[in-house]
Design a protein with these regions (language model features):
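Terminal amphipathic alpha-helical/low-complexity segments used for targeting or macromolecular assembly
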Residues: 1-202, 324-331
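Short regulatory "switch" loops immediately downstream of catalytic or recognition motifs
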Residues: 95, 250-256
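Short, positively charged
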Residues: 192-195, 263-267
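Short acidic loop-to-helix transition motifs that present clustered carboxylates
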Residues: 205, 217, 257
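Left-handed beta-helix
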Residues: 208, 213-214, 219-220, 225-234, ...
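C-terminal membrane-proximal segments flanking the terminal transmembrane helix
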Residues: 280, 318, 322-329
Length: 331
């Protein structure tokens, strides 16, 4: 085959020798001489060969090494983030932990381990002194976070007839797990730590299907029922005793990148219920307190308190002939 040239001047293989040329010399050539083929007939198309470590591979390796020298390359792995999230949630709620120890000495040791691990992970995005300070501040905030989470769990028990106990909600409800991780990530985000809060949020997102940006502000006693597909944007503000069903989106209208840092997501006031697949968009959109937003509603304007907003389905009664024909919808 022809020589395959790769970046850097290396060759993957020498040109193949034509076995017929020496046995059957062409007219005009000496005995045993090798005749040259016309360029158009030189050889078949090159076949894929092994990569050349002196050419393209070296260029790729150099690029990968350079990437690993950046700060991004030193971020904690997904496995490490998941382990920390599980440890933090398990510390607050033993229903989500396999560690049954409950004495003071053991719990204090676990808290210190969490602080040290968080500071270590923060080294990738903050200076060492700032990393230790931020980790300590998050640990100091845990009592207030725990208090809010107890109120969240109680709201789910009260709001879901299928929930039989507080223990069941804490141990089994994906909505509660997502809220727990969010409250930790939100505090870390408030303390100014970059990137890591988002990694925490994505750990919960991957596990529950609930996507809450760590920048979102959420009041007390949030009830998430089912939860799959919920999206809450960065600048969303949610009041107290709000109830969200699956598929709810609190999002932004399409904006330019220059709008980053501005309020792009809606405000949901106290005691609002948003039913399945309701979509509320825009930073100027305010849903007034004690309102109900029905399923499949698309809302981009504010509504006053005590509003009931619903989507009206179109109902068409078919005649008998239509009913006996092909269905309008198929799966």
């Amino acid at each position: 085959m022809d020589t395959l040239t790769v970046p850097g001047g290396g060759s993957s293989a020498p040109a193949a020798h034509d076995p017929d040329s020496s046995r059957h010399p062409r007219p005009g050539t000496g005995s045993g001489a090798v005749a040259s083929r016309p360029a158009a007939e030189s050889a078949p198309a090159p076949e894929p060969g092994p990569a050349d470590p002196t050419g393209l591979d070296h260029a790729l390796v150099r690029a990968l090494i350079e990437h690993r020298r950046t700060r991004v390359a030193r971020l904690p792995s997904r496995k490490r983030v998941d382990t920390f999230v599980d440890a933090a949630v398990g510390l607050l709620f033993p229903q989500q932990s396999t560690d049954g120890h409950a004495n003071e000495e053991h719990l204090l040791a676990r808290i210190n381990l969490l602080r040290a691990e968080l500071a270590s992970m923060l080294h990738a995005v903050l200076p060492p002194q700032r990393s230790a300070e931020t980790a300590g501040q998050l640990i100091q905030a845990l009592p207030a976070i725990y208090d809010r989470l107890r109120a969240d769990a109680a709201a789910i028990v009260e709001g879901d007839p299928a929930a039989e106990s507080l223990d069941e909600v804490i141990a089994a409800y994906p909505g509660f797990f997502a809220i727990t991780v969010h409250r930790i990530a939100h505090e870390l985000n408030r303390l100014g730590a970059p990137i890591l809060p988002r990694l925490f949020a994505e750990a919960a997102h991957a596990r529950t299907g609930i996507d809450i940006h760590p920048g979102a502000t959420i009041g007390r006693a949030l009830c998430i029922d089912h939860g799959t597909g919920i999206v809450i944007g960065e600048s969303a503000i949610i009041g107290d005793q709000v109830k969200l069903y699956q598929g709810v989106t609190l999002g932004a209208l399409s904006v330019l990148k220059s709008a980053a840092g501005q309020k792009r997501h809606p405000t949901i006031e106290d005691r609002v219920v948003l039913y399945a697949n309701a979509t509320v968009l825009g930073g100027d959109t305010v849903v007034g307190h004690d309102s109900v937003i029905g399923g499949n509603v698309w809302l981009v304007t504010s509504v006053p308190p005590h509003s009931f907003v619903y989507h009206t389905s179109q109902i068409r009664v078919r005649n008998v002939a239509d009913a006996l024909g092909n269905s309008d919808y198929s799966i």
